[in-house]
Amino acid sequence: MIRHVVMWKLKEEAEGASRQKNANKLKLILEGLKTNIEEIKNVQVGININSDESDEGWDVVLISDFKTELDYTMYTRNEHHKKAMKFINAVIEERRFVDYKMDI
């Protein structure tokens, strides 16, 4: 099993919306990927509940699981993922990620 974890810091304002509105939209988009991309086995999306404006905090986190590395690769090449990435790239300041094999 492959776990894909991504954290984003969002711009204060982008695409005509506030950070919070874009975080909510991003959550809906990411959760919707599971419906359209069969390789995703599990997906969780969280919005940081800490309102502290600390530079150390991140706004949105994605945790998604894939059965194999090939499934993860197929996910990254899927048109729904590419469409989501267009929105993501328009609203983020920074991104950090880690992909790892889970022992199950």
Segments and roles (model prediction):
Residues 1-58, 67-74, 101-104:
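Short S/T/G/P-rich N-terminal loop/turn motif that feeds into the first structured element of a domain
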Residues 69-90, 94:
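C-terminal structural segments of small proteins and small subunits
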